[in-house]
Amino acid sequence: MGMILKRAAVLALAMLAAMGASARTISAAEYKERMIAGWIGQIAGVVWGAPTEFKFKGVIAPDSALREWVPSMINEGFDQDDLYVEMTFIETLDKYGLTVDIRQAGIDFANTRYKLWCANAAGRTNLRKGIAPPDSSHPAFNRYATAIDYQIEADFSGLISPGCPQRVLELGNLFGRLMNYGDGVYGGQFVGGMYAEAFFETNRVRIVEAGLACIPQESLYAQMVRDMLKWYRNDPKDWKLAWRCAKAKWRENSDYQKLSSGDIDVKINGAMVLLGFLWGGGDPENTIRIAARGGYDSDCNPSSAAGVLFTSLGLKNIPAKYYTALDRSKKFSFTAYDFPSLIEVCERLARKVVLKEGGKIRKDSNGKEIFIIPQNAPAPDGYDIAWAPVRPEGCRYTSEERARIRAK
């Protein structure tokens, strides 16, 4: 046994050396286990917070507003738009590959039949009118350009990109620009970046810092993240004090409300995600409860916070009450996926991402698959200012493309 372990270690070192730059490794089995945990966290967060959604705006919800968790609640997630919308993007990637262009992504989104709101609804309406992306998200055509929408849907981008933050950015530019602009896109890239890091990191501050590295540092969203980190370092116990600080600056101060989407704005809701993720102390229930009690979009916010946390913890470290009752045969609304097939497609895409980002997939001496992933720093694009945007590009679908948009 000792000789086998030694050979495995030598093989791993040789593969790392062959990569040249520093690399991180994760077994395929551990990747899958953490990715499953991330989806469980998303589902648990959204269903637990759902009864409070937008009922508490600018006030802290009482603890009594949240039900006690019972295992069967996990099956309330199959009809949640917070989950099935991002599965449209997963299906597009699986069908057309990682190099799918934004126009095709827009056609697929335009053809969806589920009900949408805010930036998602405006973006899809624009697409159906023939306004091709990225113009479909431009503030000239979309009054909700800085709303929370892509932040809600970006979980998939990190779950299929373990340790690959640049791929998270590219997926954000591909799908986030269908409906969001500027900070509206950056919120999703930030969340996706946290997921990508959570496969390798348990320190919550470092996970947040990894997400922060994925977005333009001069953006308002980045300023909000730095504020939340500062307030956490100043007082990691009093989440209600941090909530009051976030509300005062990121919801009530007019200097930070330029082209704001109000209570659905990505920045105040991103602050509530971090409220739960940081002040929750790494505890699943505390994380969800705090993020939900922060109010505003209080099902989406605990979903994002719990999804990242559960990915970091891994399935083995999550209380079984969150997943033992999951119906594995039921399909998510408007999708072809039940839970096992969702996990299967995400694992398939993750393998492609690892290779596309310059990584390798090898077997050790025991036949166990190992993902070897180069540590490449993300390179965010320039800052798109939503209240002073560049001119629309004049993107329009051709008549042939419009003929492929069947929904009206």
Identify what each model region corresponds to:
Residues A222, L229-L259, S312-K408:
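Acidic, carboxylate-rich catalytic segments that either coordinate divalent cations
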Residues W48, K55, V59-R67, N180-D183, ...:
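Catalytic phosphate/nucleotide-handling subdomain of diverse soluble enzymes
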Residues M35-I36, T88, A105, P133-S137, ...:
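Mature, well-folded catalytic/scaffold domains that follow N-terminal targeting or propeptide regions
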Residues G97-I152, S157-I160:
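Extracytoplasmic mature domains of secreted/periplasmic and thylakoid-lumen proteins
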Residues A50-M87, I102-N120:
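Active-site-surrounding "flap" and adjacent substrate/cofactor-binding loops of secreted or lumenal enzymes
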Residues A23-G49:
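Mature N-terminal segment immediately following signal peptide/propeptide cleavage
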Residues I26, Y31, L127, S136-A145, ...:
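Accessory "access/gating" subregions that flank catalytic or transport cores
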